[in-house]
């Protein structure tokens, strides 16, 4: 089973993608994880990508396509792709690769939330500067404000988590996703999921659909 999952900043798509990975034994491919790993390595490419993210801009398609397709070549089948494609140019690159290798996408899941909810979820996020633990000032606050429960490190807000940057990211996402949504609708594999509510509530909107697809595919 091959899945695409996308959603605006703060939609919880990565959390749901990991649940899907565990339940169906898929390989998890996260564009965000791949990009962050490159940035953390402080490579020239990583430093270049960091500049785009700090401004709330999208990383150029040529860079993202190279990173993702390279990962996909090592996986081949039974994957869930988190956060890719996000532009029409990325769709073209992905479709060309899939066509050349005889791979089909079973479903494209879109987890939708409003801009207000996106800002609320993202702007409250805090990251430990030492160990990388993630907190939220509203949903998962540390015991001592500004300090990590695990290692005592200072909690910081990532530059791209600032409210004004989140709003910009949301607007860019929605603008770029419109033609992508239409593309997958025409293919008959697009499914829109309400991303508001708890993690479990959203999961129960996704699980029955994927159980059906998985069981149907297994009987082929």
From Swiss-Prot:
Name of the protein this chain belongs to: Adenylate kinase
Any one GO BP annotation for this protein: AMP salvage
Origin superkingdom: Archaea
Region (LID): 124-161
Entry comment, domain topic: Consists of three domains, a large central CORE domain and two small peripheral domains, NMPbind and LID, which undergo movements during catalysis. The LID domain closes over the site of phosphoryl transfer upon ATP binding. Assembling and dissambling the active center during each catalytic cycle provides an effective means to prevent ATP hydrolysis. Some bacteria have evolved a zinc-coordinating structure that stabilizes the LID domain.
Enzyme kind, highest EC tier: transferase
Gene that encodes the chain: adk
EC numbers, comma separated: 2.7.4.3
One Pfam family linked to the record: ADK_lid
